[in-house]
Amino acid sequence: MAAPRSCALWSYCGRGWSWAMRGCQLLGLRSSWPGAPLSARLLPQEKRATETHFGSETVSEEEKGGKVYQVFESVAKKYDVMNDMMSLGIHRVWKDLLLWKMRPLPGTQLLDVAGGTGDIAFRFLNYVQSQHQRKQKRQLRAQQNLSWEEIAKEYQNEEDSLGGSRVVMCDINKEMLKVGKQKALAQGYRAGLAWVLGDAEELPFDDDKFDIYTIAFGIRNVTHIDQALQEAHRVLKPGGRFLCLEFSQVNNPLISRLYDLYSFQVIPVLGEVIAGDWKSYQYLVESIRRFPSQEEFKEMIEDAGFHKVTYESLTSGIVAIHSGFKL
């Protein structure tokens, strides 16, 4: 008998979002520096004897899930600060470029996996709100006979300010989601935002549910990347788009040597000084080196069923944005 699909904890911001979710067991998941937390099973449905890598260590697949979970549980409170310090703020530009590449239309339903502290989700909400407000202004200018009361009513309808767009943030790590919710409240994000505790390898959503699936700095921490990609394909609507922002392979030998020196000699030290956690940031650096190259990851996305798969390398290949469509 098949086990029920993963997790079931919903929390939400905004009126009108009360989706019924299926309950079940807590699974494990998480991402890396900059970005958002992702999947690796904490309580897998089937025990597997296969070995995998946790940074430079060789561990069982079952063990990796718990270790990755502990990493992001440990760094959650300092996650955003460390992202700025480690990347010198460049991670913000990379995420802005991801949104520019996405260019969501009004009414877009976005699933942000390993969304942790909300960087992609908040950018999405800002984008769709600004687009909708520009549309409103054009419409109001065309209706000069509206009273001031009617105009004010148009702008006070918070739910409508997003043009029907919604974002679901899915992460397995409760501490990361907690930080994200606190940021949302502090920055005034109330409508169009929902939070789900869930596993990227076994998403708690129906088929053909979302228009866009994003995952930023998370997929390399998934125990079974191929399974996470298949789940992304499953939950997207026909015509839906997969977008992944992830560390990649630097092709310039000189830049690669400098990048390695900085990654292994500086980042763990920053982790110890700022977050009091050397080991977690040592793992994050090691996990970057084990992630497939741009071309290899492109092939994995195609194997999951996506079409028109492309990628763009940023900052000499330190990161790359991969894109694919479900046809």
Curated annotation (Swiss-Prot):
GO terms for cellular component: extrinsic component of mitochondrial inner membrane. It is a peripheral membrane protein. The keyword Membrane applies. It is found in: Mitochondrion inner membrane. The gene is COQ5. Residues 1-49 form a transit peptide. It comes from the Eukaryota. Keywords: Membrane, Methyltransferase, Mitochondrion, Mitochondrion inner membrane, S-adenosyl-L-methionine, Transferase, Transit peptide, Ubiquinone biosynthesis. Its EC number is 2.1.1.201. Component of a multi-subunit COQ enzyme complex, composed of at least COQ3, COQ4, COQ5, COQ6, COQ7 and COQ9. Interacts with PYURF; the interaction is direct, stabilizes COQ5 protein and associates PYURF with COQ enzyme complex. One of its GO terms (molecular function) is 2-methoxy-6-polyprenyl-1,4-benzoquinol methyltransferase activity. Its main location: mitochondrion. S-adenosyl-L-methionine binds at T117, D171, D199, A200. Belongs to the class I-like SAM-binding methyltransferase superfamily. MenG/UbiE family. GO terms for biological process: methylation; ubiquinone biosynthetic process. This is 2-methoxy-6-polyprenyl-1,4-benzoquinol methylase, mitochondrial. Gene3D superfamilies: Vaccinia Virus protein VP39. Pathway: Cofactor biosynthesis; ubiquinone biosynthesis. It catalyses: 2-methoxy-6-(all-trans-decaprenyl)benzene-1,4-diol + S-adenosyl-L-methionine = 5-methoxy-2-methyl-3-(all-trans-decaprenyl)benzene-1,4-diol + S-adenosyl-L-homocysteine + H(+). It holds the Pfam family Ubie_methyltran. It is an enzyme of class 2 (transferase). It comes from Pongo abelii (Sumatran orangutan). Methyltransferase required for the conversion of 2-decaprenyl-6-methoxy-1,4-benzoquinol (DDMQH2) to 2-decaprenyl-3-methyl-6-methoxy-1,4-benzoquinol (DMQH2).
